[in-house]
Structure formats: C-alpha cells, structure tokens
C-alpha cells in the first residue's frame, strides 16, 4: 500500500477525479478492507440522523432524543419511549442505497472482510452483507425481558402501548444499545479484531462523535 496515505475519510468535497482514482486504486490493491460507518450511510435511504441539526432534535417531543433513548427513560416512561421509538426509529420501509450495495459487492468479491456499523436499521444485511458488526444493536431484534423470546420489528410497530410477549406476558425490549447502556463486549472485540487486521479502513457517514465506538479506529494499523 501507499506509505502514510492515512485513513480514507469519506468527504463530499473531495470528489475530484484524482481522489476517486486514488481511492479505487487502493481498493484494487487491498484484500482485507473494513468499513466503519455511521448514520450518514443511511440518510440517503430516508433514515434521519437524529444527531444532525435538521435531524430529529427539532421535532416535537417533550424531551430531546438523547433523553428518550436512554435506559433510565425506557425504565421509567416505557410507553412514551415506545411512542417515540415507533414514530422515529422504526423506518421499516427504507431500502438499502448504493453504498450498502457497493459494500455487499466488495464482500462478495472477497475484498471486504467486515462492516462495522453504528446504525441499527439492518440495511447492510438487506443489501446482502453477511459479516456486519452492529455496535449499537438492531431494531430487527427484540426480546422478552422475562423469557427471552425474540420478536420482529414489525411486531413492535404493530403493537400498542408497551409491547408484551405473546407467550409469557413479559415486557419486550429492543436489542438496541440505549444511552447509559454498555456495548456488547463480543461485538466490540470482533470489531477490534477486524479493524486491527485490516489493510484498508474506509470510514463513512460518521462524525466519530460517539464513544466508545469512535475509539475503535485507534486500533487500525494499516497504511491507508
């Protein structure tokens, strides 16, 4: 690889042919690529980034999303949590976009080894990606806190109030990492493994503002 090429950061302004050519050349020469992505990857699919200024923050709710999407709020105001969650977080009609499909192609070609994502929408898998490490969980996995039975996102969307288990009546919780909750240790370890072994790390759609996820890129030792 090229010496000191640094990490490739997706940049809308940097679309001069030169950069694109360099980028494609790097992809061509790499066979152990890891993609690290955030909300920006899914905005083209119509999924709002609730951290952006024109994202969900300005929409009418009594509390900011960061408060509602916290463990404390979920425990204390579960019904209100679900009102927001159904309304804003379950974008089940969204379809994968070019980025999702391109990454799935790179994986199929044996070049891309893993997608590490901060997104919870499952669009990478919908596009055909197999090895997707979801740092913040997925809206498509929901489980009963009492018996552990799993439920689909559609089940949550179509339920009323606080969704309950149709087997034991227990409360259902989405398998997404809320504020105040820790990331899944295994997913983190897997992400560290893939990033530290990569020969190319592509970063897209993230401001790297969320820790500990953002700290993961420090494990990258490649040249590009």
Regions found by a protein language model. Give the residues of each.
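Conserved catalytic core of sirtuin-type NAD+-dependent deacylases
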Residues: 4, 8-224
């Amino acid at each position: 690889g090229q010496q000191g090429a640094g990490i490739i950061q997706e940049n809308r302004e940097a679309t001069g042919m030169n950069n694109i050519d360099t980028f494609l050349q790097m992809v061509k020469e790499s066979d152990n690529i890891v993609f690290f992505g955030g909300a920006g990857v899914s905005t083209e699919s119509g999924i709002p980034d609730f951290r952006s200024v024109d994202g969900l923050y300005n929409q009418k709710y009594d509390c900011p999303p960061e408060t509602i999407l916290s463990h404390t709020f979920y425990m204390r105001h579960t019904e209100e949590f679900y009102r927001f969650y159904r309304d804003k977080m379950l974008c089940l009609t969204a379809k994968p976009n070019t980025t999702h499909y391109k990454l799935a192609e790179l994986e199929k070609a044996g070049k891309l080894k893993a997608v590490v994502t901060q997104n919870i929408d499952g669009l990478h898998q919908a596009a055909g990606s197999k090895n997707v490490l979801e740092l913040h969980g997925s809206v498509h996995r929901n489980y009963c806190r009492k018996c552990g039975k799993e439920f689909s996102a559609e089940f949550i969307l179509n339920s009323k109030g606080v969704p309950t288990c149709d087997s034991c009546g227990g409360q259902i919780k989405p398998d997404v990492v809320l504020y105040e909750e820790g990331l899944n240790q295994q997913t983190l370890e897997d992400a560290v493994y893939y990033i530290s072994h990569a020969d190319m790390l592509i970063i897209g759609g993230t401001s790297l503002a969320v820790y500990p996820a953002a700290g993961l890129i420090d494990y990258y030792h490649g040249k590009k």
